């Protein structure tokens, strides 16, 4: 399986593909797809005992300000397997900083055609529950707590327009850097 050939989406910035590295409720293991080979590697075992609150992955052919592909979080009714590609629509962005600098995470819902009635009315970040936002914030504020010299801080939740801008900026950055 070569994930390098997966496009960023059908129609950027509002119809995108998420490549899932870590399913919802996964154990505290950080997986990352090696961008050169497309192979899923164990990045590290996270010492903080926490579960991922939603599917975690990235948007291919993007580079965020931290030098990695743009992160994406996809809440779904069930965990999505490692290495799966899921068509999504962005609904917002979680802005953070960590020991490496600015870190944005796109929040996206599965494309309407995939939902068969689940959550099909969620179009913007304010449409997801406060509980879901709190769970995501709590996870990302604390998952590095037991790792030396690592830290995170949630700055803000922003709307779908900010998410679309972040996606286009990251896509254009990748094209400009030609990497």
Swiss-Prot record:
SUPFAM superfamilies according to UniProt: Inorganic pyrophosphatase
EC number: 3.6.1.1
InterPro entries found in the cross-reference section: Pyrophosphatase, Pyrophosphatase_sf
Chain sites annotated for binding Mg(2+) 2: 71
Residues binding substrate: 30, 44, 56, 143
PROSITE patterns according to UniProt: PPASE
Essential cofactor(s): Mg(2+)
Keyword terms: Cytoplasm, Hydrolase, Magnesium, Metal-binding
Binding site for Mg(2+) 1: 66, 71, 103
GO biological process, one term: phosphate-containing compound metabolic process
Domain of life: Bacteria
GO molecular function terms noted in the UniProt entry: inorganic diphosphate phosphatase activity; magnesium ion binding
PANTHER family found in the cross-reference section: INORGANIC PYROPHOSPHATASE
Name recorded for this polypeptide: Inorganic pyrophosphatase
């Amino acid at each position: 399986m070569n994930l390098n050939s997966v496009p960023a989406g059908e129609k950027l910035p509002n119809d995108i593909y998420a490549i899932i590295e870590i399913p919802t409720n996964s154990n505290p293991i950080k997986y990352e797809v090696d961008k050169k080979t497309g192979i899923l590697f164990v990045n590290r075992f996270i010492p903080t005992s926490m579960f991922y609150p939603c599917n975690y992955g990235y948007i291919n052919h993007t580079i965020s300000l931290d030098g990695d592909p743009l992160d994406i979080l996809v809440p779904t009714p069930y965990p999505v397997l490692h290495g799966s590609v899921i068509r999504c629509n962005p609904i917002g962005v979680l802005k953070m900083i960590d020991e490496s600098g600015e870190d944005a995470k796109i929040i996206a819902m599965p494309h309407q055609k995939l939902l068969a009635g689940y959550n099909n009315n969620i179009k913007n970040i304010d449409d997801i529950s406060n509980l879901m936002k709190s769970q995501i914030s709590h996870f990302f504020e604390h998952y590095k707590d037991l790792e030396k010299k690592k830290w995170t801080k949630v700055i803000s939740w922003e709307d779908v327009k900010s998410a679309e801008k972040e996606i286009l900026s990251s896509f254009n950055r990748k094209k400009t850097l030609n990497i």
